[in-house]
Amino acid sequence: MNNQLLINLAMMGATAMLLAGCKGGQAGGDGLTTTLGNTAWNQSQWISAADAKVVTGAVQDGTRAADGASWFVSTLRNEQKVVSAKWMTAGLGVYELYVNGKPVGNEILKPGFTHYAKTKRSFTYDITSLLNTKKSADNMLSVQVTPGWWADKIITPAGHDGMIGKKCAFRGVLELTFADGTKKLYGTNTADWKAGIAGPVTHAAIFDGEDYDARRQPGYNTVDKLSSPEVNTEFGGDILPTNGAEVYLRPDLALSPVKVYVWERAEGAKDGEYGKVVVKREYAPGRSIEVHPGENVVVDFGQNCAAVPSFVFKGKEGTTLTCVMSELLNDGNGAKSRGMDGPEGSVHRLNLRIPDTGMRVNYTFGHSDKAVSFMPTATFFGYRLVSITATDDVTIESIKSVPVSSISKSLETGTITTGNDLINKLISN
């Protein structure tokens, strides 16, 4: 479950997740750099999309975050030749940065998990290499913000009137150093930025998962549909610079399937029992997987892990693939008296905070003659197994489970191996 990662993050005093090179290629820029300083924030405002939806009414255990991703876009013309550019950023919600359509940074789930009212982490990047530095050249800054860590269930208790965070927001300051040595600050405001609900991410939150429609263009390609933002005054705490990523994606620890099977019906059902799945076919690890309408494909990665699934797959435009996560299988002929929620061999989800509509990825294919790569970047899951369905035929050429952690590979200074396989497994977890 998601608590598995949160406990780890709390112990480490950090909250960060990762992601490099997905949904848009390898992240660019020259990486994290020193902050511009607290006084630079005075040149900026928190801004939100005026058309962003807000969750209202008493929040229940199954309440989902508001639909849509907020996009913020600004185009800036260089007054002189630029020799250096630093962008100091902060978000109310999970945010991803782009310069001229190229992703910035290798972190995932910025800004990470902090006390919602007291602190937010800022991330400052050297983006000089992504800019057109010539005099009078235009450069586009854009940001996607989704509800995670702010306007979703992870920080909102049941019974609260709406989510604790109402609208996603972004705040940033760009420092340009010109060829003559002068510097100028450009901060977020309602005059020079556009904002709106846009892009392929149509829903995302920590407990909910992510809905991604590849037929939709990112916000930096649909600026004409955006409008003036509004000032957001929800957060009154401190913005503190991060010391590095709060969460790391660990592709070096990626898990491959150990077992894959397909079922479509169950047998042996009786009063109080769902029965047992009838396995229609199995796939050897490493083989392509075919998903047909009406089928359930169960993929076992062999161990529970805080992670995100990574796909290479292909399907017809408009086809939706749904991937739901689980920590265990139903057993005992699906006996309801044992808390089972489906036939033996199907994935068990009754233990989840949002068992019906949460902990899932919905991916709708766009037009492509080739297989495409996808990994959700605005959420994470705790799971060992996934169950996959599709509205039309889909071929999965590759699927992996990519761990997320508060510990980067560079922080690992050694390994421990014992003569006991179970202890070795515990250590590796």
Question: Which residues does each PLM region occupy?
Answer:
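C-terminal motif of bacterial Sec signal peptides marking the signal peptidase cleavage site
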Residues: L19-G21
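Extracellular/oxidizing-compartment recognition motifs
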Residues: Q26-N429
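Bacterial N-terminal signal peptides that target proteins for export
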Residues: M1-A10
